[in-house]
Amino acid sequence: MTGAAPDPAEQFREACRAWLSKSPSRDTRVNYAHDLNEFLAFMGLDGDHPERLVAVRPHHVAAWRDRLREGGLTSSSIRRKMTVLRSLFSYLQTYGYMGVNPAHSDFVAAPAVPRDGKTVGLSPEDCRRLLDAPPSDPTGIRDRALLAVLAYTGCRVGELTRLTVGGYKQTGTHRVLEVFGKGGKERQVPLHPEAVERVEEWIDAAHIRGELRGPLFRPSRSARGGGRDGFAPRPMTRRAVQRLTEGYVRRLNLDPNVTVHSLRVTALTTARERGSDIIDLQEFAGHADPRTTLTYIRSRDRLSKSPAYVLRY
């Protein structure tokens, strides 16, 4: 007696799940799943039936790209979403489900992104104002430490939310943070003395010294699940960090386009302007390719620094 024939639709769904599970990063898997479900909704397809993706053609992908652009999404975000879709279809090709990749750049062009990226950076003066904005109460002490870590390490917001108390340690003469980046890659980032001072003050205020596995930055007691010392024993969410940063930006009347990601751009730009080598910056930022690092560096006063002014004949 032979078993029942495999269900082709279930096999297709399993291929999609296998593609999604390739990334060791939970944040990446969540973002990829969101992008895929967004495309399925655009196509009028049920998220529980991704096997219907075999009907997708290049003109469908182009229409989705145009809809995203009309909705005001940035070119870099659209490119990222199209890259996700292209990756899925390429993976499905290896399973024999797709004849061609309908999201391939040979068929659908992604919008161009200027080399000087879209995220707004801060001047050193405005960054200083932001660092000094939080008050001196316990929540303000946390915010002062959090903003200092962002500004002095250039870490991503997702990396910040994964920091642990135990990952703040002494290595030789350096105070460092163990940062877990994309793909679960770990790197040690030295802390600037001002950031060390603020983190020390926060650890004492939150009574978390010695909690090796506990999250370094935590939501206040007013948030759901607050702990006995005024802060919950769980990490802050990415959105909470974003709201916190944007709140101080509004209070200071800074450029409304400044986001939490602006602190990463500011750190890399300022370090480059003050002589840091691009390879050192690449390691500092946790980038796999130095060309990615270059897209984070903003050109301040570009015209004044033009090579035209150093020419002599």
Each model region followed by its residue ranges:
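Conserved catalytic core of the tyrosine transesterase superfamily
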Residues: M1-Y313
